[in-house]
Amino acid sequence: MKQKSISMKKMILTVACALSVLSSIAQQQVKIAPDGFDKSNNTILKGKIDTISYVSKTVGTTRKALIYTPPGYSSQQRYPVLYLLHGIGGDEKEWLNGGVPHIILDNLYAEGKIKPMIVVMPNGRAMPDDRAVGNIMAPDKVQAFANFEKDLLSDLIPYIEKNYPVLTDRTNRAIAGLSMGGGQSLNFGLGNLDQFAWVGGFSSAPNTKKPEELIPDPARASRMLKLLWISCGDKDRLLSFSKRTHEYLEQHKVPHQYQIEPGDHDFKVWKNGLYQFARLLF
């Protein structure tokens, strides 16, 4: 009888372990955008890309950013905002030139898969000469990416909220980015939960703070976040930075979406990240 009891316990433990593995696999199921998601479609309504200039007291100059307004944009309607950040070798045009966010979003609108939003693509290198020229890894240029936090919060967001019909509460403000911009998004978003409820990091770079610095209070983060998205390519040499953040979040039971998908440190992964992230917003 005792032997049967031991066998039964072993069987229950085995089944429980199997279910746990299956649950983990289900949670990590890779989501890939459908064919054509990033191809222009001339039969649908399209949003508009404009260049804006704003005075940055942080940097002491006038700075540029791109802004995407959705199809059917009206000054009589108020919109949530996504701040979409570039990588260390880019500027405010990197997403536009390499990631065609306007096409991805236009297609999603046409399919009724996202809510109308304004997307701001700033220059995350907050220094007087913010062009990606010369040694982009120079200490002052790397530091400028950290300095952008103040420029974003004190200069750019107030400019957008003064000049565009946007919703101004944290639940209608998102931040996401690729590589260096992914690290910025995690650092700034998780570091300012009173300002952002939606945070996404695509292939986040080494500038990403250590998990215990990003999320010193897991319970508070769990309460305040509407969405935390972390994704990376399986061949990306920077994968360890996303992985360590995910493992910390999992250990501390902070809800988040994490996916490792086929790809390297490239726009194939980042475009899919934007596609998936945008569908979950607001």
Feature names for model-found ranges:
Residues 1-29:
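Bacterial Sec-dependent N-terminal signal peptides
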Residues 27-282:
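Non-catalytic cap/lid and distal C-terminal segments of serine-dependent acyl enzymes
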